[in-house]
């Protein structure tokens, strides 16, 4: 890990702006990323408004935008300042290895500083911690103790994101909702984060949140003063002990959508390092849901998992009674015909883990009783159902619950409306979360491709894939389902959500599912247009997996394999849509030798896909 200190770059800039809510200022203090591509600058505008702006390359992606918050009782931190002082910049260059992830090594490389907006009088100035990465910029508010005042009550946050034009925005109004591409000025209400916008010049911008643990979730609403400005909207007030460090507000930008996915480790870098000393019990893997809630079904799922290279089975809602009733007790098995202990013992003998679903009602009431019981039972993980979300109370509760699960060596999957903000780095027993319109919502490929380039910036998503369910033939294809298993990252990958072991009938493409990893050493997005198509390549050891997904228009893409090791021959196993295949899934398989000079021509049908495994062995 390397540190170096630099003098802060200062500049005097006269702006010819006269746009409502995008204010002009004269003196700007600047912090640049290590490669110089990103620059975040600070100044004071009219009425002492604290301002920042962001540049990516030669382009200004965030125009002068307001900062600050308002306390309960009226104390206002959004104006009255006379000066912006940017402290000495520090260069940080380190790396760390995640317990699991999309890459085996994460570089943490940025310039950081603290900016202080000063104002006259006894009130403290507004202080921010700022980082400029090669992939984006981030800042968070710092509030220290003030005399005898040891806490703060924040009513609302006023962080603005003022854009250069009425950009097209990929809007989603709930974490599991459907995306629509609209102008900023056409947003109906507050939208989820990450929020991705596309400029006329082809640049892609993302606004995100990182390290949300004990604070209210940020959403983004259109400003009442400017149709091209988004303003942070907290899900309720915040009460915090001082000193306070808020979650990070993140601005990313790139010249292509795939670069934002390749850079999504930025959110991880903004979270604290792993706090679990012994992580040997944390195990990624593939999952089948047991839909009959029976002993026989559980045993069959274990056998299926062993045969097809899965690592877990899951019992979902109903195993302990009606999840909607408080009278149900998750400390006991109430489902007739289910000997859960027998299934767990059988699974353990076969090195298969058992995951249990518990509704938030019973977790909130009984978590401290449940965890030692589940440890004795020998379960591998918990799926939190219908978690309360958004406000500070339930955000804090959920993170505390995940930390408690770690004490009992229990892994966690969170459903339904929650989206990750990088805290899986700190507690890597937090395996995945929903917060996506996955296969339960039967998304056509155009929605899947919107999710891929928007939601997946936030981190792992439990997509609850279905493979044999009848909806697949209505909105996508089976080859596309295989491709999505590569494109969408989750260390716990639910591959058979509505399916049963009896659904499988010896389909030859199951060789792909058996070989498929769920964690990776490297990620590359080779092609991509939001909502239209994507080609995602992931490496595990010496092998590569390439997922090619397409929306409405049939197309052929050229895929260069120049990322393969030179002077080495591989074998490409390609799984594609084939109406003439003699199976109900209509997946054809072809094999050919390839090397780093190979360029694959990949045809994809409307709402189809192609999955490719490139193996280094014979």
Language-model segments: residues:
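Glycan-recognition and catalytic regions of carbohydrate-active enzymes
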Residues: 115, 500-545, 582-585
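Aromatic- and carboxylate-enriched substrate-binding clefts and catalytic-loop regions
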Residues: 318-477
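C-terminal beta-strand-rich structural cap/linker in extracellular carbohydrate-active enzymes
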Residues: 592-618
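Solvent-exposed beta-strand/loop surfaces of large extracellular or lumenal domains
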Residues: 92, 104, 171-179, 183, ...
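Carbohydrate-binding surface patches
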Residues: 529-566, 610-611
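N-terminal accessory beta-strand-rich subdomains and adjacent acidic, glycine-rich linkers
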Residues: 26-270
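An acidic-aromatic substrate-binding cleft motif
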Residues: 244-312, 316
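Bacterial N-terminal signal peptides
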Residues: 9-18
């Amino acid at each position: 890990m390397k540190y170096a200190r630099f003098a802060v770059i200062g500049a005097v800039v006269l702006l010819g702006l006269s746009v409502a809510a995008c204010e002009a200022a004269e003196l700007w203090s600047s912090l640049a990323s290590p490669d110089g591509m990103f620059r975040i600058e600070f100044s004071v505008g009219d009425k002492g408004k604290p301002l920042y702006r962001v540049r990516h390359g030669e382009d200004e992606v965030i125009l002068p935008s307001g900062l600050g918050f308002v306390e309960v009782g009226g104390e206002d931190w959004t104006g009255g300042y006379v000066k912006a002082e940017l402290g000495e910049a520090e260069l940080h260059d380190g790396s760390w290895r995640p317990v699991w992830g999309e890459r085996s090594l994460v570089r943490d490389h940025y310039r950081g500083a603290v900016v202080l907006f000063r104002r006259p009088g006894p009130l403290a100035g507004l202080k921010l911690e700022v980082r400029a990465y090669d992939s984006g910029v981030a800042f968070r508010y710092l509030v220290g103790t003030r005399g005898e005042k040891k806490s703060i009550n924040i009513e609302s946050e006023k962080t603005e994101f003022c854009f250069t034009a009425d950009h097209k925005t990929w809007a989603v109004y709930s974490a599991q909702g459907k995306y629509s591409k609209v102008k900023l000025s056409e947003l109906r209400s507050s939208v989820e984060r990450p929020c991705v916008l596309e400029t006329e010049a082809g640049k892609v911008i993302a606004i995100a949140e990182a390290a949300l643990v004990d604070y209210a979730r940020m959403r983004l609403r259109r400003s009442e003063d400017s149709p091209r400005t988004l303003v942070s909207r907290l899900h309720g007030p915040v009460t915090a002990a001082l000193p306070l460090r808020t979650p990070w507000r993140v601005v990313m930008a790139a010249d292509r959508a795939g670069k934002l996915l390749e850079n999504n480790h930025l959110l991880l870098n903004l979270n604290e390092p792993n706090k679990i000393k012994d992580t040997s019990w944390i195990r990624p893997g593939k999952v089948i849901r047991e839909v009959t809630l029976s002993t026989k079904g559980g045993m069959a799922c274990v056998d299926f998992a062993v045969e097809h290279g899965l690592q877990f089975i899951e019992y979902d809602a109903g195993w302990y009674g009606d999840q909607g009733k408080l009278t149900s007790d998750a400390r006991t098995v109430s489902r007739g015909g289910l000997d859960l202990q027998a299934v767990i013992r059988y699974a353990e003998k076969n090195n298969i883990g058992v995951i249990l679903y518990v509704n938030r009602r019973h977790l909130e009431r009984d978590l401290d009783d449940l965890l030692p019981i589940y440890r004795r039972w020998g379960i591998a993980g918990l799926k939190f159902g219908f978690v309360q979300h958004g406000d500070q109370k339930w955000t804090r509760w959920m993170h505390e619950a995940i930390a408690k699960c770690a004490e009992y060596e229990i892994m966690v999957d969170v459903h339904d409306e929650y989206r990750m903000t990088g805290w899986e780095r700190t507690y890597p027993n937090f395996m995945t979360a929903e917060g996506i319109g996955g296969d339960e919502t039967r998304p056509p490929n155009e929605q899947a491709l919107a999710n891929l380039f928007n939601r997946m910036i936030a981190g792992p998503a439990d997509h609850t894939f279905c493979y044999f369910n009848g909806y697949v033939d209505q909105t996508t294809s089976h080859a596309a389902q295989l491709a999505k298993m590569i494109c969408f990252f989750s260390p716990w990958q639910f591959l058979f959500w509505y399916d049963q072991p009896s659904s499988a009938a010896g389909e030859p493409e199951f060789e792909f599912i058996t070989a498929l990893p769920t964690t990776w050493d490297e990620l590359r997005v080779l092609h991509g247009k939001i909502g239209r198509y994507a080609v995602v390549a992931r490496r595990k050891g010496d092998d590569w997996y390439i997922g090619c997904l397409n929306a409405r228009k049939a197309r052929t893409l050229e895929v260069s394999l120049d990322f393969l090791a030179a002077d080495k021959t591989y074998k490409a196993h390609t799984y594609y849509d084939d109406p003439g295949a003699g199976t109900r899934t209509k997946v054809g398989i072809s094999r050919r030798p390839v090397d780093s000079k190979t360029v694959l021509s990949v045809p994809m049908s409307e709402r189809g896909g192609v999955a490719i495994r490139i193996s280094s062995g014979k």
